[in-house]
């Protein structure tokens, strides 16, 4: 199994907690799916904690401490503040997969907006009251497809 790791030189804007969490994740050889199951979040929400893009609850801190063998005091110090969202990626992104996600919004953003406005009226989809997940589908020809679900309160 391939595991996501962190090259801190590629991500200079991440908080100190990112290096702490990714180092322990690599040492324990745990996937985000395994960590998510332990703390009771989905994989993407768990990864967002690692990248400093989500706020950790006291329960998250305790469970991460137990699973990753990191002092709860260290995690409390590093994770108890408010996340500084959106600063970890330069714009436009250079990493190819992240650029493709950016490109989706560039190409389909106004189409999404038009359809959402027709279905819901004037407003916006929340990125705070929000959940997302990633699933893998394999078609009849054996091709793998990524399915990304975005669910936000209107």
Curated annotation (Swiss-Prot):
EC class: lyase
Superkingdom: Eukaryota
SMART domains, per database record: Cyanate_lyase
CDD domains (UniProt xref): Cyanase_C (cd00559)
Catalytic-site annotation from UniProt: 100, 103, 126
Keywords from the UniProt entry: Lyase
Chemical reaction(s) catalysed: cyanate + hydrogencarbonate + 3 H(+) = NH4(+) + 2 CO2
GO biological processes: cyanate metabolic process
A matching Pfam family: Cyanate_lyase
EC assignment: 4.2.1.104
Any GO MF annotation of the entry: cyanate hydratase activity
NCBIfam families (alphabetical): cynS
Function of the protein: Catalyzes the reaction of cyanate with bicarbonate to produce ammonia and carbon dioxide.
UniProt record similarity statement: Belongs to the cyanase family.
Protein name per UniProt: Cyanate hydratase
Species name: Aspergillus fumigatus (strain CBS 144.89 / FGSC A1163 / CEA10) (Neosartorya fumigata)
Gene label: cyn1
